[in-house]
Amino acid sequence: MAGSTSASLQTPYFPSSTQINPVRVDHTLPLPPSQPSLSFTQGLLVGQLSVVLLIGAFIKFFIFGEAPPPPSRGLSNRTSTHPRSYSINAASTDSSPRPLREKPSTSNILRPVPSSSTNTRSILRKTYYSATPTHPTPKHGRPRLYHSSHQPESLDWFNVLIAQTIAQYRQTAYILKDSPTSSILASLSETLNNPEKKPSFIDIIKVTDISLGEEFPIFSNCRVIAVEDPNSDGGRLQALMDVDLSDDNLSLAIETSLLLNYPKPFSAVLPVALAVSVVRFSGTLCISFVPGPRTSDQTMSPIPTPHDTTSEAIDDQSSDQPSPAQNPDGPKDAHANTSNTTDASSKHGIPKTSLAFSFLPDYRLDLSVRSLIGSRSRLQDVPKVAQLVEARVQSWFEERVVEPRVQVVGLPNIWPRMGRTGLRSSQEEPEAGSGSVEIPVMTSPGADGVSGGGGSGGGSGGGGGGMRGIDRGLSGREAGYEALRYRHAACGGHQNQSGRDGGRGGNEQFAMPGSMPDTVTET
């Protein structure tokens, strides 16, 4: 009994559903720290080496690396439609570049120009212009015109530039119409009344009306052709373009008298009034570049006549030399200037490129001639007078700018110079109706200065200075219309005065700087 009681006390009773999990105690100790595989010296060396490698890579790729190509302006999406082909001369030149340390002598500083640089076919090939046919047919002893297979161009941009130039000339001529020395009227009067040209039976020619026109010539259908020329390598290139001028009021009116000097001088006087207007002009303009004066003399041999020689000499004197009225010492100064120019050109001996232009013989020039003959009983629009005037104008035009005769003009020096450097203003076009507009106008060195065309804001420059600060006195639109026509009254030599031009002396001559007297019909 006692034994069973002690056994029951020692062994407690637990239900079968209850289980006691034994508690596990982790008796593991922390591991000691691991020793580094590299020493301090080795790590320092590795760090220094990495820094040196980074510096070397920076110097190689950022300092001595090739610069990226500059971005193209507006042409990033465009590709060249013509593959560029390199010539043999260019390849040989580029393959052996000149060392930089080589000291060149004075004879080999400028690299030689290939002999084919001025060849017509070489120029056309490098500019991708096909103007020479595959099998050209020669012609006996005459320059052969090769028809271009290239598409003709419209020349719209060229028409805009020419129109701006002509409009500026018209405006300048109107602004300077009151100048006694630089006016278009003075130039025309001096040319028409030249005693070496004018016959003795014609009295003083007085210009009564000048119209510089309102329209502009239109150029179109431009094409480049190759012309055979024995004096040049591979011929020469010539640009042909159609020009048309119609519905314009370009006109000139004069008054004079026919003198009957038999049996005694001034036995009878017959007043004559003429007005010539250009109704329409159309033709084909030929433009080519002449390499030098020697080549031009050989290529374009003139057919001089006594009349042509005299006319050219007079035209040169009237265009290049001032008149005796403008400069009393004109002959001496003009002769000195001419001799200096000739000496300078002969001293240098450098051939300058010139521009030669002419018209083909198939041009069309329609004129309108109005005449009034007599004092009391007047004859109006006599057909025979119109025929004589038209024939004289046609002859004057053909003797100067119709093939085979050409006009040769020296090209100006376009090398950039600081003396010709200007600054474009922020306001391109002044508003219409503004009070004064500053327009620089170059005057001849012999002029003492001219007054402004507006009347109130005219300035005078001494010693041939420019004229600035011109007060036009008209709005931009009115000045444009008034610039087209201005008259010179026949009686008393005074101008027709209006409210804007009141108080002006009519005997003042007008002229345009750079006017060409040879463009006026000769009588």
Curated annotation (Swiss-Prot):
Residues assigned to the Lumenal compartment are 1-43
Recall the GO molecular function terms of this protein's record.
lipid binding
Entry membrane topology: Single-pass type I membrane protein
Q: Where is the composition biased (Gly residues)?
A: 449-468
Q: Which domain of life is it from?
A: Eukaryota
What compartments host this protein? Endoplasmic reticulum membrane
Q: Name one GO cellular component term.
A: ERMES complex
The SMP-LTD domain extends over 151-412
Segments on the Cytoplasmic face: 65-523
GO BP terms, alphabetized? mitochondrial genome maintenance; mitochondrion-endoplasmic reticulum membrane tethering; phospholipid transport; protein insertion into mitochondrial outer membrane
- Present the record's domain note: The SMP-LTD domain is a barrel-like domain that can bind various types of glycerophospholipids in its interior and mediate their transfer between two adjacent bilayers.
Stated name of the protein = Maintenance of mitochondrial morphology protein 1
Look up and give the organism this protein is from.
Paracoccidioides lutzii (strain ATCC MYA-826 / Pb01) (Paracoccidioides brasiliensis)
